[in-house]
Amino acid sequence: MTEKDWIIQYDKKEVGKRSYGQESLMSLGNGYLGLRGAPLWSTCSDNHYPGLYVAGVFNRTSTEVAGHDVINEDMVNWPNPQLIKVYIDGELVDFEASVEKQATIDFKNALQIERYQVKLAKGNLTLVTTKFVDPINFHDFGFVGEIIADFSCKLRIETFTDGSVLNQNVERYRAFDSKEFEVTKISKGLLVAKTRTSEIELAIASKSFLNGLAFPKIDSENDEILAEAIEIDLQKNQEVQFDKTIVIASSYESKNPVEFVLTELSATSVSKIQENNTNYWEKVWSDADIVIESDHEDLQRMVRMNIFHIRQAAQHGANQFLDASVGSRGLTGEGYRGHIFWDEIFVLPYYAANEPETARDLLLYRINRLTAAQENAKVDGEKGAMFPWQSGLIGDEQSQFVHLNTVNNEWEPDNSRRQRHVSLAIVYNLWIYSQLTEDESILTDGGLDLIIETTKFWLNKAELGDDGRYHIDGVMGPDEYHEAYPGQEGGICDNAYTNLMLTWQLNWLTELSEKGFEIPKELLEKAQKVRKKLYLDIDENGVIAQYAKYFELKEVDFAAYEAKYGDIHRIDRLMKAEGISPDEYQVAKQADTLMLIYNLGQEHVTKLVKQLAYELPENWLKVNRDYYLARTVHGSTTSRPVFAGIDVKLGDFDEALDFLITAIGSDYYDIQGGTTAEGVHIGVMGETLEVIQNEFAGLSLREGQFAIAPYLPKSWTKLKFNQIFRGTKVEILIENGQLLLTASADLLTKVYDDEVQLKAGVQTKFDLK
């Protein structure tokens, strides 16, 4: 493996969304805080966006739009403590005009390093900066810088904590009120603010040095900015070093954030932060690296990039003290306002198999919001608990009723809140965690109540029809391009993904009852009826309709749209701009019915369909894959990995690999037309790692046993990674036509179709089939 497999390096200046996207990819974090990878010298502009976020810290604002008050709850962009300005002989240096630029994110050491060379009237000036975050003392982070010039001059460095910042990362959100906090206090090395409506106190303490000399505080023209400065005579070719140590805390997780940051600041330093950072990531890569040797130039690097961002989005060291989960963009940008979606389903299984304590921490975020979910259901006239499609601070619904169509710049209705399947995803995550860990305490700590209350919601929605089948109306599936029937409102009926996942949930509820968990009798009785009689629409070829009457929708001339527009991954917006609705057509944003295969596997889904007294042909998976692939535009990054996994099952390894390669580089290549500017796509990052491990390596941990049946692409000569299954660490190595397994404790496994007992610490070899 070479150095390039551990870094992303940018050597040319980019502008606009491409620059924003690079800064998202170069973000640092530790589960508690996220620091966007903008240059230290930059402020919010068309080309740069510094951002600092803390998990769980949200604020609400109100803006009048078309005569209506629109309430938005946003993950707060904190005051910016990483801003510097450099003056030479009294003139501000414009690093945007650098003649040389190099920006690097180092995954192995979790460092962001930037180098700028500027040509000035007197000669050349070079600035090198390195940013780092402390994963152990997770409130701490900092940076160091080096300056050298090939001439003598008066050097002045100013460093700031800028409390004038707004939430401005997402261009289409800028029309809304985006001032999230008010600065309440500034003193030497300390800025304190409070969010405007959620009233969370934010405290930032810092100390800055140049060659060991402390920066004095200076007056600022802006009373929202803490400024410090130091000035020296710089000799020709003299290298000077400066650094800043920063500690942040909020009243969301700390009782007295001001006292905390001041005490912690006196106890830490940039060297201590760097030491903790180095030690932490050394262990992460020892435990969690996925090594792939292949003929694809960027694959290994992309795999590590995805691991890096997932491990920054959450980690037990921080999350055990937080009431937070992982948003769809992690802590790297303000896309989707930092809200938590069903995307947890794409990352929680990864945590469960690699750092199970973190998975448990994230599940508690949902359990802690069960009361809010019950209130959501009550407000909507439903029973039980209804989790929101978009969740933030307290767990009420944060989805908007309107959204902006960026094709025609018109505000359109947003019905995405009807994706009630988010509740099924949460229960699924509980199940995956319990399967991989055997930790049933998550159930007694509120998980069982969550299962029961969401079951109440679903069974209340399930209505018995004249056909003797139970039907669920008024919902949406994962495919967001279908919000209702043509010309109607109110969602769709009998979404296959929803109905089959509910069948699965009712089966688990039954199993829990049989294991002695207390389930209300009436609930269990209705569950027994519904789990055998939910409705599906299956045609004569074995295609499972995405929802009832789906086959009656019109077909789309995709070739015509591609000829007219080129990129059609957001064909929904194109159609609406033309005055037609995707509700009328068989077109999908992403895998919907086929998400069942990603969640449960082919065999399990087959059993569920049979349980509902339907029959499928032997080739049903291929039939459904072909049918829906022809109608899917992959408007979500999470779509392709589903098809990749299915293609592995069908033996189409070349196409599976093509889907994987495209998906795994979603952010690096920014395949969604600039959306990485708003933060990385955490869901697809977790999903692609799962495809590598669960599909190509053939690992299955879902059914209570460690089972593996590898089928590597021909272009891969080696695959190596670890998994944790029920407390046992298993080292997996596939190379030279062999599978080699080493378990930390005795473990009964299934290799292809044979059961094998692994002995603790003994490497066991198997021939690949």
Swiss-Prot record:
Family as reported in the entry's similarity comment: Belongs to the glycosyl hydrolase 65 family.
Temperature effects on activity: Optimum temperature is 35 degrees Celsius.
Active-site residue numbers: 480
Lineage, uppermost ranks: Bacteria, Bacillati, Bacillota, Bacilli, Lactobacillales
Major enzyme class: transferase
Record's keyword terms, sorted: Glycosyltransferase, Transferase
Name listed for the protein in its UniProt record: Trehalose 6-phosphate phosphorylase
UniProt-listed Enzyme Commission number(s): 2.4.1.216
Pfam family, one: Glyco_hydro_65N
Gene3D superfamilies: 1.50.10.10, Glycoside hydrolase, family 65, N-terminal domain, Maltose phosphorylase, domain 3
pH dependence text: Optimum pH is 6.3.
Keyword Transcription attributed: no
Assembly: Monomer.
Keyword Transmembrane annotated: no
Binding site for substrate: 342-343, 589-590
Superkingdom of the organism of origin: Bacteria
Catalytic activity line of the entry: alpha,alpha-trehalose 6-phosphate + phosphate = beta-D-glucose 1-phosphate + D-glucose 6-phosphate
Function, in words: Catalyzes the conversion of trehalose 6-phosphate into glucose 1-phosphate and glucose 6-phosphate.
Biological process annotations from GO: carbohydrate metabolic process
Example GO molecular function: trehalose 6-phosphate phosphorylase activity
InterPro entries per record: 6-hairpin_glycosidase_sf, 6hp_glycosidase-like_sf, Gal_mutarotase_sf_dom, Glyco_hydro_65_C, Glyco_hydro_65_M, Glyco_hydro_65_N, Glyco_hydro_65_N_sf, Malt_Pase/Glycosyl_Hdrlase
